[in-house]
Curated annotation (Swiss-Prot):
It comes from Kineococcus radiotolerans (strain ATCC BAA-149 / DSM 14245 / SRS30216). One of its GO terms (molecular function) is rRNA binding. Belongs to the universal ribosomal protein uS8 family. PANTHER family: 40S RIBOSOMAL PROTEIN S15A. This is Small ribosomal subunit protein uS8. It holds the Pfam family Ribosomal_S8.
């Protein structure tokens, strides 16, 4: 069976593993998911990510980040633009997550960017997800 929204599946797996205090979470690999993982690592929400060969295709594994007392680095995740309702933002109207404390992940003509990077470049695009 095909998956209609692989990004939502990735965020759900990440949210569930984070809630259960798992150290790692695995999911089917795609280039888009690996770019999202790069952003999550650069923003400090995950420790690292790796791509492994599986029996069928490739597998993306994320190492979750926790604080000294097992506090979660990711407080919340939300899929914004969905297959049934796409959400776009102009460069002049980019979303701010929790007043700048969180990150909005955008798909732009310059690739996947955070809201801050898109603001610096002056580009808008599809708002994929919020992470805080």
């Amino acid at each position: 069976m095909t998956m209609t929204d692989p990004i939502a599946d990735m965020l759900t797996r990440l949210r569930n593993a984070n809630s259960a205090y798992h150290d790692t979470v695995s999911m089917p690999y795609s280039k888009l998911k690996s770019h999202i993982a790069e952003i999550l690592q650069a923003e400090g929400y995950i420790t690292s990510w790796t791509v492994e060969d599986a029996e069928v295709g490739k597998k993306l594994t994320l190492d979750l980040k926790f604080g000294p007392n097992r506090e979660r680095a990711i407080a919340g995740l939300r899929r914004v633009s969905k297959p049934g309702l796409r959400v776009y933002a102009k460069s002049t109207n980019l979303p701010r997550v929790l007043g700048g404390l969180g990150v909005a992940i955008l798909s732009t003509s310059s690739g996947l960017l955070t809201d801050k990077q898109a603001n610096k470049k002056g580009v808008g695009g599809e708002v994929l997800a919020y992470v805080w």
